[in-house]
Each structure stands twice: as structure tokens, then as C-alpha cells.
Amino acid sequence: RDCVRLDGFNFGNSPSEYTRDRVENQTIALTTTNGTRALMACLDAEQILIAAFANFTTVVNAIAGHARVNIICAGTNGEITLEDTLLAGALAAGRNASQQNDQALLAIELWRQCKQSDDLNQNIFKKLLVSQGGKNLQQAGMVSDIKLCAQLNTHSILPKLSSHSKIIQL
């Protein structure tokens, strides 16, 4: 939707719009181009968690004890995205499972390359800038959103999607 707020919606694409004072104790109807499809494809899963760099450690701790974890990347318009793959690699590496499929191994390698930096948040930011999603946000004048999304562990919330109600609980 080209990073543009839809008519009739109170919030747009920017995570900076979703401040505590605006969303706390509110019911939010959210639609996305790609994320909604990815979440709906997971409805048969035992548990559906939503991850970002912002809640990285919380999600890693939540999945640590599970024997099998599927990390689903939403992508963009049916394409693999760098930002999704980087986060998937971070989650898979953080989980430290004894067996990984090839997709996980590729994502983990991307994450390991990114981690080779004194300033991990800055390195994540640089990776996100060169991704297609990052380029789209730059064209929309939303570089500050990329910077915000590149910050690790700014939140400890664990969003869970109920497969029955299709409501995300924080």
C-alpha cells in the first residue's frame, strides 16, 4: 500500500504512530499487505507468536523449550525479504536447536554476518536500509521508522494470535 495510511484508518504504516498513550487498552483493527496472509497461513499451529527485533529476546525465550518451531516470514508481494530473513536467522540462532533446515542455516549465516559489529543495532539498521522494504520506506521519507525497527529488545511484549478468534493478544 506504498506506506500510505488508508482512508478511514486512524494509524498508518509507521510503528511510531502506535504509542502507548494512543493504543493502550484499545482494540485495534490492523490489516497488512503481507503479514495478514502469513498469519492466516499459520492458523493450524499450536501457538502463533509475532516477532520483531523489538521483542527479540522475549520471543527467543518463549520458543526455547519447543521441540519444533516454524518461523514464517511474511515477505513482500510473494518475495523473500532481507529484513524477514535477518530476523528469522536471529531467532533460529537464538533458539540454538540441534537440527536446522537449509533455510534456517542460510538465515542464521546472514544473522552471524550482521552480528560481527561493535554496534549491532547500527548494523541491523544498515542491513534494513539496503533491503527492498528499507528502500520503500526511504522513498516514503520514513527512514526514522527503519531506525526504530532496527533496535533490539525495546519491548518485552509477546504478541500471540488466537487461531480461533483471529485476535492478537499482547
Question: Which role does the model predict for each range below?
Answer:
Residues 10-27, 31-33, 41-47, 82-170:
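Long, charged alpha-helical interface segments
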